[in-house]
Amino acid sequence: KGDSYYLQDESCRVVELYLAEDGVGLTDTWPTGDGRVLKVEFFVEWATDVTQGIPAGTYKVVARDEESKGIPREFLKPGGIASGYPNVFTYPQGTWYEKISNGTMKEYARIDGGTMTVARDGDKHTLTIDFIDCDKAHPHHVRTTYSQDTPINVFGSHP
C-alpha cells in the first residue's frame, strides 16, 4: 500500500488485508454484496514485497491518541495493527469488522485491541486472529483462523 501515514522516512509500510465471505465483492473501491468482511490495516518493514505474502509473526493492535484519534508516531512500526478510527462510517479507517447487505454496512465492530498471528509455510499462510472491539463495558471478540495454500491476492489500491 505505501506511506499513507506520511512518515516520510521509509520506516514502515502500511498494508490493508480484507478477509471476506464469498458473497462479498472486493474489486471496487469499497466492498460490495452481502456477507461479512474483516479489514485489517497493519504495518510491515518498508522493504517488504507484499506480492511475496505477509511476513510471519505476531501483529498487535495499537492504541490511538485519546484527543487527536491519531496513532502516536512511536506505535507506527512493523508488527503493529492500526486500531479502528472512531466514528467514521462512510469509509472506516484502521481495522474494522463489518456485516454488509447490498454493499451497505449493517453491523460493525471497531477493533480496539488484540492480535493477528501469521504463520508461513512457503506460499501457505495461516492467520490466527483474536481482536476485541471498542466496547469497554461489554467487549466482544472477533476471532477467526484463515488458511490459504496459494499466495494472498494483492491489490494496487483499495481494497
Predicted stretch roles:
Residues 7-117:
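Surface-exposed helix/loop patches within compact recognition domains
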Residues 44, 112-116, 126-159:
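Edge beta-strand at a domain terminus
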Residues 6-7, 76, 90, 132, ...:
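Compositionally biased, low-structure terminal segments
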Residues 13-16, 122-128:
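Short, hydrophobic/aromatic-rich segments at coil-to-beta transitions
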Residues 81-83, 88, 123, 138, ...:
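Alpha-helical protein-protein interaction elements
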